[in-house]
């Protein structure tokens, strides 16, 4: 846990999933402080929109203004709810919207934590363009190293005149005034042909590797199990290309597409609808924090290409949680398959959780691993 003192309220905040006590990661950053400083003396009129509030620092600080928290992360929503409870703030004080929803009209203040992907930022700025006015206070913040010329140009192109502040604690802010510059329409998704198939893969803005098949997934697809029955999970499904391939290779199985990103799950659904519509009755789509709340002993296999970062921070906490959830939800003698960068040493992590791990394939960068849920371990 960490403490954030600001001009609105003193907060105790924690990350979600929680980090270990040996190497704790903070649930807020200097950019959050810097953004809140700008509002200390500002009279807030109209709706407050907060975009990409990773762990709820801004939403908790401004809870008395009934803000809207907008983003593409279910884990961020869970983190914000947890931090609201931790600070004794009514959860109903914050309204949650995903990035593709309609934003409230004529906001008084818009606070943006600049996301990792420029595509998501552009989608969000285009959505804001439909609702902000010239009187809306628009401020974005990030680590100074994460604000590039391309970031500023995007604000200018979509919304209007843009300036930056001096760096403070290695954070920098962007101030923008809306003046409705001319702007061409943009497609909601980016599409590309999947090599070796007749499939077209569609990707919403925040999907990992949205402009082409990532090399880890490409390697994984060469080693997917075939002719399974029952329910298979594509955990952290992204655009669903792994799950789509599983539907094709396992015609007697049902595939459950799971991701914490609403855009990822929407992309997966779209890709099944457009490429294998006959398999929709063998498909389920779930926005979730890994397999939280899913009954144990349900699945015949889980396949996962786990992330090794959360927001801008490198961490294996999300992967660790995925592995534990997979073990709980697998049937006895059923298997977890993962692909990962070799340097992450997930072999020993899986062996610790499952009691076993086998290397299926390896190349100079990636490894495909398999762990079996054995009946003797509880």
Curated annotation (Swiss-Prot):
Pfam families: MTS (PF05175)
Zinc-finger found in the keyword field: no
Reaction catalyzed: guanosine(1835) in 23S rRNA + S-adenosyl-L-methionine = N(2)-methylguanosine(1835) in 23S rRNA + S-adenosyl-L-homocysteine + H(+)
Keywords: Cytoplasm, Methyltransferase, rRNA processing, S-adenosyl-L-methionine, Transferase
Any GO CC annotation of this UniProt entry: cytoplasm
Assigned EC number: 2.1.1.174
PANTHER family: RIBOSOMAL RNA LARGE SUBUNIT METHYLTRANSFERASE G, RIBOSOMAL RNA SMALL SUBUNIT METHYLTRANSFERASE C
UniProt name for this protein: Ribosomal RNA large subunit methyltransferase G
Phylogenetic classification of the source organism: Bacteria, Pseudomonadati, Pseudomonadota, Gammaproteobacteria, Enterobacterales
């Amino acid at each position: 846990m960490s403490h954030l003192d600001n001009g609105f309220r003193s907060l105790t905040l924690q990350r979600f999933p929680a980090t270990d006590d040996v190497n704790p990661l903070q649930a807020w950053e200097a950019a959050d402080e810097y953004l809140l400083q700008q509002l200390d003396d500002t009279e807030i009129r109209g709706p407050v929109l907060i975009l990409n509030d990773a762990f709820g620092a801004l939403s908790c600080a401004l809870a008395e203004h009934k803000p809207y928290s907008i983003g593409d992360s279910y884990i961020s929503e869970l983190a914000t709810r947890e931090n609201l409870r931790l600070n004794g703030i009514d959860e109903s004080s914050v309204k949650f919207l995903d990035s593709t929803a309609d934003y409230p009209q004529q906001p008084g203040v818009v606070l943006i934590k600049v996301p990792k992907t420029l595509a998501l930022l552009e989608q969000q700025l285009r959505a804001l363009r439909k609702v902000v006015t010239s009187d809306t206070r628009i401020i974005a913040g990030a680590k100074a190293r994460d604000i590039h010329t391309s970031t500023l140009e995007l604000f200018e192109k979509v919304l209007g005149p843009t300036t930056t502040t001096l760096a403070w604690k290695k954070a920098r802010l962007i101030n923008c005034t809306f003046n409705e510059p001319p702007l061409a329409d943009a497609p909601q998704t980016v599409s590309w042909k999947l090599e070796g198939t007749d499939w077209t893969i569609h990707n919403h803005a925040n999907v990992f590797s949205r402009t082409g098949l990532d090399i880890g997934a490409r390697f994984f697809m060469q080693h997917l199990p075939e002719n399974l029955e029952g329910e298979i999970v594509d955990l952290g499904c992204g655009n669903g290309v792994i799950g789509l391939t599983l539907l094709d290779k396992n015609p007697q199985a049902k595939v459950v597409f799971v991701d914490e990103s609403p855009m990822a799950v929407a992309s997966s659904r779209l890709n099944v609808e457009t490429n294998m519509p006959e398999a929709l009755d063998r498909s389920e789509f779930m926005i979730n924090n890994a397999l939280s709340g899913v009954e144990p002993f349900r699945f015949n296999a889980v396949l996962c290409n786990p992330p090794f970062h959360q927001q801008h921070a490198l961490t294996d906490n999300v992967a660790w949680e995925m592995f534990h959830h997979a073990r709980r939800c697998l049937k006895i003698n059923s298997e977890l398959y993962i692909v990962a960068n070799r340097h992450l040493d997930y072999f020993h992590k899986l062996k610790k959780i499952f009691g076993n791990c086998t290397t299926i394939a390896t190349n100079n960068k990636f490894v495909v691993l398999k762990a079996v849920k054995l009946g003797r371990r509880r």
